[in-house]
Amino acid sequence: MTAQTAEEHSLTAVIGLEVHVQLETDTKIFCGCSTDADDNEEPNTRTCPVCLGLPGALPVLNEGAVEAAVKVGKALSSDIPEETRFHRKNYYYPDLPKNFQITQYDAPICDGGELEFAVDDERRTVAIERAHLEEDPGSLSHAGGSIDTAEHTLVDYNRAGTPLLEIVTAPDFRSAAEVRAFLAKLTEVLEYLGVFDVTRDGSLRVDANLSIVDSDAVGENGSIDEATLEAANRTEVKNISSHKGAEKALAYEETRQKNAVQRGREVEQETRHWDESRGITVSMRSKEEEKDYRYFREADIPPLRVSDWKEKIDIPELPDARRERFREEYGLDAETASKLTSTKQVADFYERVADTFAPELAATWVADNLLGELNYRDMEITDIEGRLDEFAHLIELVDEDEITVKNAEEVVLRRMLDDGQPPGDIVEAEDLGKTDDDAVAAAVTAAIEENPDAVEDYHAGEDGALNFLVGQVMQETGGSADPGTVNELLRAELDG
């Protein structure tokens, strides 16, 4: 694209993704080494001759990895072929002990598919080109700086051989924000399927291909013809490990390329590294083409007939379907249903609570009160899964009018999360049981007698006066009176 063209027309980003998902299996994809990583483990201790690529070591395919891949394919509406095969992808890099990677080439385990998601309240659908199984390389630690400034680099092969599913999208994204929304939705689906651990470091990594085209080449539905795509030089951005990181990296790269085009410079076709600490991409190497990898069949792994058992693999209810069911079955609004299905653990927790209490009451407590307090403490629902009975008891105390909603929210729930105490003990220790009617009535009378100015303001029509008097009663009763009852008693006495 010439500088003149760039000045006359706006520019549009074209983005495609390669999403690498670490599958949740007990052992690596081609050997019996554990995948259970420990933050304190020594480097190069979860290895064997197979994952180190030593001569004579033969790979054995992990059935669990295949099952997980089939589940993902079904969730993405992919075609699961009758037969799938493995190939060797040849390249030289320090984290690849064999100097080739066992992956899939012309017969991936998942072919085609799509994923629908929302961005800025607009529904988008991105096509999935394929998803294939492969082994994860080792990991590199760049000492003394980032990849382009490090004094030296250390290699750890503990990760080598961890099962990966690489999900390749069509170049259907037109902004970094769309990419972030897509990754959030994909993560949600994968978590519901139970095929990966979202809390594990590096469990989802992204390589993104980005190029810039003239906006006039983009059709009304966002389509771009093949010739335009082929003519545009693209960069591959690596080292993206989060949804937020993907948005930041691609926003930077889009700006960098647009600036280059607008200044009449050619965009180099290269591989770039996202340096999160500096917020920039840096050049790594010229971008390889498919022919550079010299793919050939992996002779040590025979073709796999997935058709023999793929129909036996079921997938659970997915987030969109569960969201819709919550709205229909429990009468929830869209926002609340979305909160309650944000993760499978939250949805499961809510349904167990809703089995005991009115669904609307359970929804309010889980979606608004509990999730809000957990988020404030940087906790997850999984941190309290074993305390479901205690949480149910708290709702029961409110439902049976034994404590006020205010005390339940602001005292009991917070102490439960901070100190680990059961609700009954907190109520007893803090004397939070509801004040009896006579005591509330006495506190109402005292508030009126002791605050004549507020009474005068109330009769003058000032709205804040009643709230002040309610506050005085609540203070007198230690917050154990019901605010609604106090309000009614005050109005009755003031208006009588």
Curated annotation (Swiss-Prot):
PROSITE patterns linked to this entry: GATB
Reactions this protein catalyses: L-glutamyl-tRNA(Gln) + L-glutamine + ATP + H2O = L-glutaminyl-tRNA(Gln) + L-glutamate + ADP + phosphate + H(+); L-aspartyl-tRNA(Asn) + L-glutamine + ATP + H2O = L-asparaginyl-tRNA(Asn) + L-glutamate + ADP + phosphate + 2 H(+)
Top EC group: ligase
GO process terms (BP): glutaminyl-tRNAGln biosynthesis via transamidation; translation
SMART domains found in the cross-reference section: GatB_Yqey
EC number: 6.3.5.-
InterPro entries: Asn/Gln-tRNA_amidoTrfase_suB/E (IPR017959), Asn/Gln-tRNA_Trfase_suB/E_cat (IPR006075), Asn/Gln_amidotransferase (IPR018027), Asn/Gln_tRNA_amidoTrase-B-like (IPR003789), GatB (IPR004413), GatB_C_1 (IPR042114), GatB_Yqey_C_2 (IPR023168), Gln-tRNA_amidoTrfase_suB_CS (IPR017958)
Keywords (A to Z) from UniProt: ATP-binding, Ligase, Nucleotide-binding, Protein biosynthesis
Superkingdom in the source lineage: Archaea
Single GO term (MF): glutaminyl-tRNA synthase (glutamine-hydrolyzing) activity
Role, per record: Allows the formation of correctly charged Asn-tRNA(Asn) or Gln-tRNA(Gln) through the transamidation of misacylated Asp-tRNA(Asn) or Glu-tRNA(Gln) in organisms which lack either or both of asparaginyl-tRNA or glutaminyl-tRNA synthetases. The reaction takes place in the presence of glutamine and ATP through an activated phospho-Asp-tRNA(Asn) or phospho-Glu-tRNA(Gln).
Quaternary structure annotation from Swiss-Prot or TrEMBL: Heterotrimer of A, B and C subunits.
Family under the similarity heading: Belongs to the GatB/GatE family. GatB subfamily.
Protein's UniProt name: Aspartyl/glutamyl-tRNA(Asn/Gln) amidotransferase subunit B
Source organism (scientific name): Natronomonas pharaonis (strain ATCC 35678 / DSM 2160 / CIP 103997 / JCM 8858 / NBRC 14720 / NCIMB 2260 / Gabara) (Halobacterium pharaonis)
